[in-house]
Amino acid sequence: IIVYLISYFISAVGPGAISAQAIMIIFSVSLSVQLGIKPYMMSSMAILGTVGGTVSPVALTGVIVHDLTAKMTPPLNANTPLLISITIMNAICALVIYVIFKGYKLKMPEYKAGDNPSDFKAVSFNRDQIFSLIGMAILIVVVLAFQMNVGLVAFVIAVVLSLCNAVNEKMAFKLIPWGVLILVGGMSILMDVTYQVGGIQLLTDILKRIMNKTTAAFIMTLISGITGWFSSGNGVVIPTFVPTVPDLANALGGVSPIELIISIVAGAAIGGLSP
């Protein structure tokens, strides 16, 4: 449970699921070996936690969805219902895994003298880590309270940390997920072109033929999930299907656009766990 909560928090404060998973999966597996817990249960908790937190307004998926909904006519603000819904969904999945693998029956292993983790002294945060935590707190407050662009604020904070010699710039550049950035940027350009040539309208017309107001949310979740098995949720699935929501909601009648957006993101989030 603690691994899930830590993973959720790390993902929600900005890095998103991909970056947070790179940290938390390694940490959770190492911790599971020390505690005698099944590694796949701990790693699953870490993954679900990061996926739940990535839809926060300052994290990767949340930012992508916000940008897409802001372009709609009229603009939609799905941040809060999206965060609540995806958080509940992933918490339920984590609870199911916890019960299936009998996490409630786990007992602390017996340690030899000097090997018990509880005997180790706590390590204090150093100067650079404290500065980084302060920067993350400022990012959250500025973005949520003053509605400023999360990317711009993040860059400014990164520059300030660099000027304070609180970061290793070379290491920071190496840790940037360039592949993800290029994928998301490239797909954004592609989707703009697709929209201009009528591709989104064509996709919307196809979807309208196979669903009604009762089945719309289920079908969108299913299609997004299956598509997410073979492609990136953030780079492909969400930018492709979210723009179809306004026309679908108008055509079907009685369907909430926010409900459809949540369905798309939920399907993409779970489908994105595919190898």
What is each stretch, according to the model?
Residues I1, I84-L202:
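Hydrophobic transmembrane alpha-helices of multi-pass small-molecule transporters
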Residues I1, L68-T69, A172-I176, L203-M211, ...:
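Hydrophobic alpha-helical segments of integral membrane proteins
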Residues I2, M41-T50, K174-V184, F241:
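Cytoplasmic-side transmembrane-helix entry/capping segments in multi-pass membrane proteins
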Residues I2-S30, L35, Y40-S43, I210-L273:
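Hydrophobic alpha-helical transmembrane segments of multi-pass integral membrane proteins
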Residues L5-F9, L31, V51, L95, ...:
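Alpha-helical transmembrane segments of multipass membrane proteins
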Residues Y8, A12, V58-A59, I86-K102, ...:
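Transmembrane alpha-helical segments of multi-pass membrane transport proteins and ion-pumping complexes
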Residues V29-P117, S256:
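Membrane-core helix-loop-helix motifs of multi-pass transport proteins
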Residues A59-L60, D67, M187-D205, V255-I258:
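Hydrophobic alpha-helical transmembrane segments in multi-pass integral membrane proteins
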